[in-house]
């Protein structure tokens, strides 16, 4: 049972003037409780950064289980049922959402919507909807086991009210007490949970897919660093290195300076970074590569980019485009997947190109007159004998 208080986060709660001998009732105590709750939320809200809201990591779960546990069913009666089993997050107002199904029968968190109602909201190519959880901190949901021995008989506890809703992605507004839990997509005439979508998260450890990205990017980051060391060693140990080889080594040295600055923090703290910081880490790497190329004289840059093209099948225009995309990312807290996909494309291209160059006996000679050494690398997703940021995890 929910006891509505008709309150919102915008209400002003006054402190009650307590006097000895005054008559009091439950409403006076509830008003005092709401005053302190409201003050606490306002204090939290002032300390939260702009992107400080979203899912929180659950220390009681394994990494592969992090994120909201949610189910979507399209029934035979053409209705869409969304059921939330577990959710842990923080709203923009600083309110902690900690919901577990089955703990309290009074707090079943689900919604059933006729599929035709959702279809009527389709506009153009927009066939995705955000699944929203709204918390009402001042509505009191009775919880616990009723105690009939007390007078009057009552439920011992109350919890805030949670409700689910759907909103087309282009019309979604993240208000102070709303969390995006996931995304619904339409496939044919059926509605399914979009498992590729990553909702707003407060850290990489809050979602299994972000943890996977951390590990995968770490493998490629490690590969780029190792290849950069090998390229520099090959170039400086030859007295007849060409300008192409020397310029490649210069880029590698810039990369190595950057990885040296990132090494400790990435290895020890990277898993707990905010998603925006992870994007910043690799966007900065792209910027370093871009600037290093542009420090070269124009013809030398063109020769080097053309040389990369010979060994990577990535044209100079495409390679610069990958760097520019990674540099120019505009972080969207509600669309993490897009930013991580851009970074993944850049890292994969750079990692494969660098590994290809390492396999050459002589860096700088062109493809038609060079001996290709044995390639000693495998798929980035495989195991590596070198250090990776998650070796200790």
PLM features per residue range, with description:
Residues 7-96:
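N-terminal "first-domain core" detector
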Residues 108-147:
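Elongated alpha-helical scaffolds
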Residues 4, 147-286:
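Mixed-charge (acidic/basic) macromolecular-recognition segments
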Residues 97-105, 196:
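Short amphipathic beta-strand/extended segments with alternating polar/hydrophobic composition
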Residues 268-393:
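Extended, amphipathic alpha-helical scaffolds
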Residues 91-93, 103, 135-139:
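Short, flexible loop/turn elements at secondary-structure junctions
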Residues 43-53, 145-158:
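Short linear, low-complexity motifs centered on an aromatic residue
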Residues 4-12, 17-23, 27-31, 35-40, ...:
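Non-catalytic accessory regions used for complex assembly or targeting
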């Amino acid at each position: 049972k929910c006891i509505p208080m008709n309150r919102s986060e915008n209400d002003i709660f006054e402190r009650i003037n307590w006097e000895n001998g005054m008559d009091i009732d439950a409403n006076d105590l509830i008003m005092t409780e709401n005053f302190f709750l409201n003050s606490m939320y306002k204090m939290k809200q002032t300390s939260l950064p702009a992107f400080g809201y979203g899912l929180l990591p659950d220390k009681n779960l394994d990494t592969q289980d992090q994120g909201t546990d949610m189910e979507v069913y399209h029934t035979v009666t053409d209705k869409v049922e969304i059921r939330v089993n577990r959710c842990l997050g923080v709203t923009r107002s600083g309110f902690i959402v900690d919901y577990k199904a089955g703990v309290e029968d009074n707090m079943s968190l689900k919604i059933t919507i006729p599929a035709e109602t959702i279809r009527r909201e389709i506009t153009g190519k927009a066939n995705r909807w955000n699944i929203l959880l709204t918390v009402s901190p001042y509505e009191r949901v009775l919880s616990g086991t009723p105690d009939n021995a007390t007078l009057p008989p009552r439920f011992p506890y109350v919890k805030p009210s949670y409700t689910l809703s759907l909103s087309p992605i282009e019309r979604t507004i993240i208000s102070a007490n709303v969390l995006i839990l996931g995304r619904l997509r339409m496939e044919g005439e059926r509605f399914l949970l979009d498992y590729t979508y990553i909702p707003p998260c407060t850290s990489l450890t809050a979602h299994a897919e972000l943890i996977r990205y951390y590990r995968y990017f770490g493998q490629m980051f490690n590969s780029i660093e190792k290849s950069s060391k090998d390229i520099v060693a090959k170039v400086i140990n030859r007295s007849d290195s060409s300008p192409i080889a020397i310029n490649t080594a210069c880029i590698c040295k810039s990369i190595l300076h950057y990885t040296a600055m990132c090494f400790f923090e990435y290895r020890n703290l990277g898993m707990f970074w905010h998603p925006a910081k992870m994007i910043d880490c690799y966007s900065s790497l792209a910027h370093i590569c871009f600037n290093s190329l542009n420090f070269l004289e124009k013809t030398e840059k063109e020769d080097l980019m053309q040389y990369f093209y010979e060994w990577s099948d990535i044209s100079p225009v495409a390679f610069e485009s990958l760097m520019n995309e990674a540099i120019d990312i505009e972080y969207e807290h509600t669309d993490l997947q897009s930013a991580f996909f851009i970074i993944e494309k850049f890292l994969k291209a750079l990692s494969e190109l660098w590994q290809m160059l390492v396999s050459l006996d002589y860096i700088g000679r062109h493809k038609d007159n060079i001996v290709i050494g044995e390639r000693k690398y495998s798929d980035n997703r495989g195991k590596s004998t070198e250090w990776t940021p998650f070796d200790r995890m």
